[in-house]
Every structure is written in C-alpha cells, then in structure tokens.
C-alpha cells in the first residue's frame, strides 16, 4: 500500500510537496480541507491494511507522528497571541472542529479503531 499522501506531507523525504496539507499550512498559513481529506483517506486505508498487525513499520510511525506533532504545534501557535502565526482562512470555532477531527483520526489510527466520520461536526461523513 502506498504512503503517497503521508510522504507528500512529510518534509524530510523526496516526495514532500509544498501544496500538500502541511505544506499549505506552513507556507500559506491556511488549512486546506481538500488536502486534509486526502491525508485522512490514506490514514483510514492504512488502518484497514494494518488492522491485524502487532507492529507498524517504523518509517510510517515516524512520519505519522511528525505530521501529527507539526499540525498540533501549528494550531497551538495560532492560538498564542505572542507567536505571530495565524491560520488565516478559519475562525476559531472552525479550527476547533478541524483540530478535534484531526486528533481523533490520528488517535484512532494508533488505537486501531478509526472513528465513525458521521459523528464529526465538520467535514465529510463517508465512513461508518
């Protein structure tokens, strides 16, 4: 299974792209729903693939953790008035909804139980 979206969002590999979700977040100070859902879809696919695995490939775990920590740190910077970084295209309530979904999807991946997307306030609900 490909890790194309994960690699696009991981700055320390050749496949990284500035027009990925994390690239846009960094370079344009904007949250791209379109790019986020590409990454999320891949997390659901990878979760299905590794559902019965006792161990996950280290390179995949490192890249997932780095993407997670970068995005959560960036959201923290947005809410820190002394930081100077602001996600320009969302108000605080929109960002809270996106942060919640992002966090629960990543936590669900590591737990091995992906959340049902119909429970989220924001975004698509195409997964039961």
Question: Which residues make up each language-model segment?
Answer:
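Amphipathic alpha-helical binding modules
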Residues: 67-128
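Short, solvent-exposed, charged loop/turn and helix-capping segments
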Residues: 45-61
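Short helix/strand-capping turn motifs
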Residues: 7-9, 58, 62-69
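Short terminal alpha-helical segments
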Residues: 1-40
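Charge-rich, solvent-exposed alpha-helical interaction surfaces
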Residues: 9, 24, 42, 98-101, ...
């Amino acid at each position: 299974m490909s890790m194309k979206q994960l690699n696009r969002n991981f700055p320390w590999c050749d496949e990284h792209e500035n027009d990925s979700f994390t690239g846009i977040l960094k370079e344009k100070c904007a949250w791209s729903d379109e790019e986020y859902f590409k990454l999320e879809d891949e997390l659901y696919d990878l979760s299905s693939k590794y559902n019965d695995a006792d161990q996950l490939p280290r390179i995949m775990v490192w890249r997932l953790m780095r993407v997670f920590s970068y995005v959560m740190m960036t959201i923290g910077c947005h809410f820190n008035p002394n930081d100077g970084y602001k996600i320009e295209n969302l108000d605080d309530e929109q960002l809270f909804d996106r942060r919640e979904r992002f966090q629960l999807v990543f936590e669900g991946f590591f737990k091995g139980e992906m959340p049902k997307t119909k429970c989220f306030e924001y975004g698509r609900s195409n997964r039961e």
